[in-house]
Amino acid sequence: KLLLTIPEDNLSALWFEKPLNPCVKVIATKSGSDYFDAINLGNIVCELDGFFAEGGAKNIARRDGMATTMLSATTFIGRIPDYYFQAVGSGTGAIAAWEANLRFLEDGRYGNHKAKIYVSQNRPFVPMYDAWKADSREMLPYDNDKARVDANSVVAKVLTNRKPPYSINGGLYDAMKDTDGEFFAVTNEEAEKAGKLFEELEGIDINPAAAVATASLIQAIENNQVERDAVIMLNITGGGEKRFKENKDIFYLQPTRVFAVDADKEDIKE
């Protein structure tokens, strides 16, 4: 069985081409909550008998799966990219790309350099950006209520993790320091403009998080932060949703129960 936790306001993100097996269930945190609240709910559930956490960034298999984008790009290009661009919520994908790069160095056939990890967040929800710009390994204080408001005001809500694996050993901070990386902050307007430009040029729509990454690449080019002849990998983490949904019946998962953000273990157990 699979139990998913998600903020109630983001249930529209769970869409499918056909109904799922009833072994898949969803519970949600009430409207106004954010992904951290949903993650916290999931953590409480995993304290109950019979439930095990997927593991997030600490799940090696998950990181290795995410690393296939770097593996695919590098083997196709024939060399390690000079820059790796991605929008981040937890930063797990960027960590995975860095780890894949280190394996390529051991392999030796694709170059002896590290791709600079260039990541981005969606303003006003930019806690990792703020920490990086302050040259701080530790995340800066972020009021919970303000964080929830900020998280619900961005177009790329999947990027709104309040407790990402940024500070831990081997986390995003280390990946960026090791590669001379950089952090970008992108407004909703910049993301929407970049998404439209991508669709015009490439012929396919992209998801908001991918649009944030695209906007960060535009920023880097405009600010001369990448060379004109650089080999750049832009990780488009999702796209084609608009095209896929055309003339199709789409099914949405509905929560079996919605919990308050301060629900305790006994409430959830019931």
Predicted regions: what they are:
Residues 86-89, 115, 176, 192-196, ...:
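Substrate-binding/catalytic subdomain of NAD(P)-dependent oxidoreductase enzymes
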Residues 1, 11-15, 63, 90-98, ...:
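Short glycine/serine/threonine-rich phosphate/pyrophosphate-binding segments
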Residues 2-80, 148-173:
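Small/polar-residue-rich loop-to-helix segments that shape phosphate-bearing ligand pockets
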Residues 214-270:
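Catalytic phosphate/nucleotide-handling subdomain of diverse soluble enzymes
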Residues 58-60, 88-92, 119-126, 159, ...:
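Glycine-rich beta-alpha junction loops
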Residues 17, 35-50, 103-114, 118-205, ...:
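Active-site/ligand-binding loops adjacent to catalytic centers
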Residues 62-99, 106-108:
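Glycine-rich ThDP/TPP pyrophosphate-binding loop and its adjacent helix/strand module
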